[in-house]
Amino acid sequence: MKFNKIILHCSDSDIPAHDNVQVIRSWHLQRGWNDIGYHYYINYFGDIFPGRNISRQGAHCKNHNKDSLGICYGGASGPNVKQLLAMKRIIHAGHILLDIPLNEVYGHYHFNSGKTCPNFDVDKINWRRGAY
């Protein structure tokens, strides 16, 4: 896969039992998908879990799955500091390893006006600043 952008998402649930990559995967399988739609999942503690293999097209943003890396954090109320730092780590790795430009980071809402996901203003974050 050749990715040219990153799209950020949230699970839209603050229920602790939902903060699990396997729960998200099962939700997506119940929808008839063949796997979790996101390439990475970040839990409340900032732990990063692999989702759909990056060699496969995601299923996270209609009309943009072919060229985007999908990252989802657990929660509905905006990411905490640990989750933001984890996002930055993935974004910087995507830039270094996959040649994704750092100015090509979007929220799901950028591509679907009916969405607020990832429930924070992606444009206010300086993704170029160091992740560590």
Give residue ranges: language-model regions:
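Basic/polar, cationic surfaces and motifs that engage anionic cell-wall
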Residues: 1-11, 15, 44-48, 53-54, ...
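Short Gly/aromatic-enriched secondary-structure transition segments
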Residues: 21-28
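Short solvent-exposed loop/turn micro-motifs enriched in small/polar/acidic residues
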Residues: 33-34
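Short, surface-exposed beta-strand/loop micro-motifs that present aromatic residues
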Residues: 59-62
